[in-house]
């Protein structure tokens, strides 16, 4: 997370992670354009609940139309990617304005969600599910 001066505009960067997804979020002042992997945000994340979850740090800090976001995200599925975007947006907002720290921290947006897929065990069908038991 570093702050740099890019073409006379204040640019802030945040890296977010969730499951196996990594998102690099670049924020600068603008009109509210959001681009994910050079695509429009609404066409990249098509499920409404995932869009709402990814943009919740902006809604919480009342900065939804004030910044342009450029996001590079890779790895994992769409749910993990939207969680990584949320984490990256939160970190970039904190880097841009440190007064957002208490709001973001109290809602858990600055904390990385460390839940991962549990591995499959041998002698079982899945991670927790066992094979069907036959008494006779």
UniProtKB/Swiss-Prot annotation:
Question: Which keywords does this Swiss-Prot/TrEMBL entry list?
Answer: Ribonucleoprotein, Ribosomal protein
Entry keyword annotation includes Amino-acid biosynthesis:
no
InterPro entries on file: Ribosomal_Su5_D2-typ_SF, Ribosomal_uS9, Ribosomal_uS9_bac/plastid, Ribosomal_uS9_CS, Ribsml_uS5_D2-typ_fold_subgr
MF (Gene Ontology): RNA binding; structural constituent of ribosome
What are its GO biological-process terms?
translation
The record's section on Pfam families has:
Ribosomal_S9
Give the record's GO CC terms. Answer: cytosolic small ribosomal subunit
Recorded family membership: Belongs to the universal ribosomal protein uS9 family.
Q: What is this protein called?
A: Small ribosomal subunit protein uS9
What gene name is given for the protein in this entry?
rpsI
């Amino acid at each position: 997370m570093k702050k740099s001066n890019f073409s006379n505009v204040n640019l802030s960067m945040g890296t977010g992670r969730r499951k196996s997804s990594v998102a690099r979020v670049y924020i600068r002042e603008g009109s509210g354009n959001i681009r994910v992997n050079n695509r429009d945000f609404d066409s990249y994340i098509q499920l409404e609940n995932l869009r709402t979850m990814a943009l919740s740090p902006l809604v919480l800090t009342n900065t939804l139309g004030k910044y342009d976001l450029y996001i590079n995200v890779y790895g994992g599925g769409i749910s993990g990617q939207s969680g990584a975007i949320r984490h990256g947006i939160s970190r970039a907002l904190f880097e841009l304005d440190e007064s957002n720290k208490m709001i973001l921290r109290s809602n858990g947006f600055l904390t990385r969600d460390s839940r991962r897929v549990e591995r499959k065990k041998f002698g079982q069908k899945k991670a927790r599910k066992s094979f069907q038991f036959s008494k006779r």
